Amino acid sequence: MFEINPVKHKIEEVAERTQVLRGYLDYDAKKERLEEVNAELEQPDVWNEPEKAQALGKERSSLEAIVETIDQLEQGLEDVSGLLDLAVEADDEETFNEAVAELEGLNKKLEQLEFRRMFSGEYDSADCYLDLQAGSGGTEAQDWASMLMRMYLRWAESRGFKTEIIEESDGDVAGLKSATIKIIGEYAYGWLRTETGVHRLVRKSPFDSGGRRHTSFSSAFVYPEVDDNIDIEINPADLRIDVYRASGAGGQHVNKTESAVRITHVPTGLVTQCQNDRSQHKNKDQAMKQMKAKLYELEMQKKNADKQVMEDNKSDIGWGSQIRSYVLDDSRIKDLRTGVETRNTQAVLDGDLDKFIEASLKAGL
């Protein structure tokens, strides 16, 4: 004989949490807006304005993720209740187990939707840029920056995000001096915003003939792609624009023309670079877009006294502003803010970051 009361209580609990989320996420308004967006996208002339059409498509995906999930939860709970009644009437343990398994699946789906409440910031739903910068440690730090880039690219791929390498400056011997990656996908900035900070690597260096233990640092800085309509005042006199030959991977045209662009905002010291297009003009436009996004992020951080301003985050790539320690010869990676750690170092370096990211978001970092 199987015990049905715990399952009934779980159904009630999941139903109650679903209703709370329904209200919190404003399901009715989102369903109405989804119908409006679908109607707009069905108009034959919608692609006359490609940017608007793309924005509508992105909005539809975001709305569907909420509306359809809540619909599935509510219908699923009805189905599970029906299965449970059948199992009791027929005294059928197989049907009972099926109901329990379906309920567990619904609970996981609900937990994923509940997690979206962590993404309440104005730009959490936006695409984002990730700047990586090698710090203390010479070639070892430059190799570490390259390892971090691979880690984040793997993580993005595992979540179904698209990535573009905007800028990549090779190290003197190996690895990278710096790189900028654009990460494209729903809530990309929300997921990655707590990764800003210094990452410390401790290992026996493959670049040391004596095999000694080395400590090196590289920094990550995450900022959202801001809407072109956001009014960010940039005085042209505050900008220094340099052109140069691209030094990283980029196809046959790299190093043949000075198409890469570096923009420095002199008052703040902020720098953006782009080299991923043959056209200097397009690279300049992209670098300006990144500069606008960085200045916006700086302004937002200045307004929020609970966050470190960007100058602090970028100033000292060393001991002072670490967020995570990767001690490879002890097989231990630990987040210094949340205390979360793992001994499966290779999995993390292969992009398994969710445990660290989720803990930092839940901690309100």
Curated annotation (Swiss-Prot):
What this protein is reported to do is described as: Peptide chain release factor 2 directs the termination of translation in response to the peptide chain termination codons UGA and UAA.
Keywords, alphabetical: Cytoplasm, Methylation, Protein biosynthesis
By which gene is this protein encoded? Answer: prfB
Tell me which residues bear N5-methylglutamine: Q252
Keyword Protein biosynthesis tagged: yes
Lineage, highest ranks first: Bacteria, Pseudomonadati, Pseudomonadota, Gammaproteobacteria, Enterobacterales
Keyword Ribonucleoprotein listed: no
* PTM comment, free text: Methylated by PrmC. Methylation increases the termination efficiency of RF2.
Q: From what superkingdom does this record's organism come?
A: Bacteria
The molecular function terms of the Gene Ontology recorded here are: translation release factor activity, codon specific
**Pfam families cross-referenced by the UniProt entry:** PCRF, RF-1
Q: What is its main location?
A: cytoplasm
This chain belongs to which protein, by name?
Peptide chain release factor 2
Q: Which GO terms describe its cellular component?
A: cytoplasm
Q: Which PANTHER family match?
A: CLASS I PEPTIDE CHAIN RELEASE FACTOR, PEPTIDE CHAIN RELEASE FACTOR 2
Q: According to the UniProt record, which cysteines are disulfide-bonded?
A: none
Q: Which family does it belong to?
A: Belongs to the prokaryotic/mitochondrial release factor family.
- Where does it live in the cell? Cytoplasm
